[in-house]
């Protein structure tokens, strides 16, 4: 069972605010605590939808590092990695789900008994309460609060 790092909420708040201050939005943040030193991976995107360049990532690294140092959220050595999400990543934001409607996805969720289930189908929509996918022409509604991940897939493979 995957347990999120206890500092994740504070780190996400800090990274999100720093990203907004510099014209970006936070796409994802992961803490790889098993690495020595610990690694903080931050993915940013432009709210306009424009591509994030390597120069953008490099330029964002300094203010993000400064924000981390000034916040005292982390009190151990760490490596900071800044990148942008690419195709094949997990879908997370409302924008992701709008952009990739009618694309093939894998959905991993927990059934009512707590067992992990995986469904592959075509993304139809995400509502406030459900994710709808088409599996061989049949619509499946999956409760949002049971979803562990939604990832773009290759339709042939």
From Swiss-Prot:
The keyword Hydrolase does not apply. It is found in: Cytoplasm. One of its GO terms (biological process) is translation. Keywords: Cytoplasm, Ribosome biogenesis. SUPFAM superfamilies: YhbC-like, N-terminal domain. NCBIfam families: PRK14634.1. Belongs to the RimP family. Required for maturation of 30S ribosomal subunits. This is Ribosome maturation factor RimP. It comes from Synechococcus sp. (strain CC9311).
């Amino acid at each position: 069972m995957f347990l999120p790092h206890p500092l994740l909420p504070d780190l996400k708040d800090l990274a999100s605010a720093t990203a907004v201050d510099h014209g970006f939005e936070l796409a994802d943040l992961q803490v790889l605590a098993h690495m020595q030193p610990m690694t903080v991976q931050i993915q940013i995107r432009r709210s306009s939808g424009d591509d994030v360049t390597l120069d953008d990532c490099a330029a964002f690294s300094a203010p993000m590092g400064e924000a981390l140092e000034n916040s005292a959220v982390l009190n151990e050595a760490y490596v900071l990695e800044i990148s942008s999400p690419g195709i094949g990543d997990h879908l997370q934001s409302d924008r992701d789900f709008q952009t990739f409607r009618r694309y093939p996805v894998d959905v991993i969720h927990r059934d009512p008994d707590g067992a992990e289930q995986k469904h592959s189908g075509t993304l139809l929509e995400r509502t406030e309460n459900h994710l709808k996918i088409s599996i061989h022409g049949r619509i499946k509604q999956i409760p949002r609060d049971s979803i562990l991940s939604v990832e773009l897939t290759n339709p042939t493979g």
